Curated annotation (Swiss-Prot):
Cofactor entry: pyridoxal 5'-phosphate
Name of the gene: hemL
Protein name from the UniProt record: Glutamate-1-semialdehyde 2,1-aminomutase
Gene3D superfamilies: Aspartate Aminotransferase, domain 1 (3.90.1150.10), Type I PLP-dependent aspartate aminotransferase-like (Major domain) (3.40.640.10)
Keywords: Cytoplasm, Isomerase, Porphyrin biosynthesis, Pyridoxal phosphate
Any one GO cellular component localisation term in the record: cytoplasm
Cited InterPro entries: 4pyrrol_synth_GluAld_NH2Trfase (IPR004639), Aminotrans_3 (IPR005814), Aminotrans_3_PPA_site (IPR049704), PyrdxlP-dep_Trfase (IPR015424), PyrdxlP-dep_Trfase_major (IPR015421), PyrdxlP-dep_Trfase_small (IPR015422)
Subunit structure, as described in the record: Homodimer.
GO biological process, one term: protoporphyrinogen IX biosynthetic process
Protein's organism: Pseudoalteromonas atlantica (strain T6c / ATCC BAA-1087)
Listed HAMAP family: HemL_aminotrans_3
Amino acid sequence: MQKSEQLFARAQKHIPGGVNSPVRAFRAVGGTPPFIEKADGPYLYDADGKQYIDYVQSWGPMVLGHNNPIIRQAVIDAAQNGLSFGAPTEAEVTIADLVSELVPSMEMLRMVNSGTEATMSAIRLARGYTKRDKILKFEGCYHGHADALLVKAGSGALTFGVPSSPGIPADFAKHTLTMEYNNIDSVVQAFEQYPDDIACIIVEPVAGNMNCIPPVHGFLQGLRDVCDKYGAVLIFDEVMTGFRVALGGAQAKYNIVPDLTCLGKVIGGGMPVGAFGGKRDIMQHIAPSGPVYQAGTLSGNPVAMAAGLAALNQVKRPGLYEELSEATKTLAEGIKAIANGLGIPMSVNYAGSMFGLFFTDVECVTNYQQAINCNTEQFNHFYHGMLENGVYLAPASYEAGFVSAQHSPEIIQQTLQIAEKVLADVAKKFG
């Protein structure tokens, strides 16, 4: 990794930490991050020319794999007509129609430029719509870096939240309640204490930022019931799960209808795009139809919209999501079987084409506390072994993995063979 090491050293001169998003710095696992030069199908290629089987997939959106030729050509064609207009286009109307067709709960939607913009705007809308200030989120869920969301639980279950980053005033954090994921009783208790104050619940319907943790039976329905009872807005943050765990997202997989949904770069074919949308009567409160302000010069960018249309029209292919789910199950269960056979405690979670590997003897990880108690030393050793042998996983034990349509059965089996070799080394070191 000689060239990557040189680039990383050079990057730290003018880029804080040498990266433009913290997890890329490899602080959680140690070592030097490979600097990527190109990507194609299931593969990444670093600056030193090494090929990796990629299970990060740009943190989720590359459902079709990298450098999809139809998306690439759509971008080229759109770019020939100009890169940005700052004006309405037919493409943004067409993609809004298509998203609404595929995710029926999104009766109206607004394009933005990132998942953070989507969640930030959805929360502002929920507050404006309900005329309430408090929001409820869950420990271990990540919804972007907006001030109101970088908040952790206080000293007691129902105490005011406290900032999880410097630069966030305590006055902002006090309006955020943080509950335990998959614990509906804590949510009910919060609403009983603040029945007229909570504007919304925001939740990852499948948590993807404490590794991959699906909802336990009844959890999402419980959130729907509580919001209905107290007049709060239920927001599904489907930035990771949208068009990933099912064609209609997690809400289709689990048959729960939220009031608002947030989507990320998956609807831009991997380009910088986001969207939020939902019930018509709520969305009509957004400017210029209503009083809740939201805007963006680059929102609905014509090149990104072209990429998104090319992507969404392909993921409609019958059978795609069944194939993705089967490949993901084969991979996750295969790695678990190898680990357990070598005497390494491991459990796995998966939902659609998202998966999580947990070095723990807990049979099924369902919350943040269980996730953070996993064996990070074993994970880090496993991570570097896989990386050295050409498999690129997320460089932190708290991040989900993703399978794409380009991960063929042969590539899955190749990955399992590499995992067997690496896990044998883990067993030897920690046995």
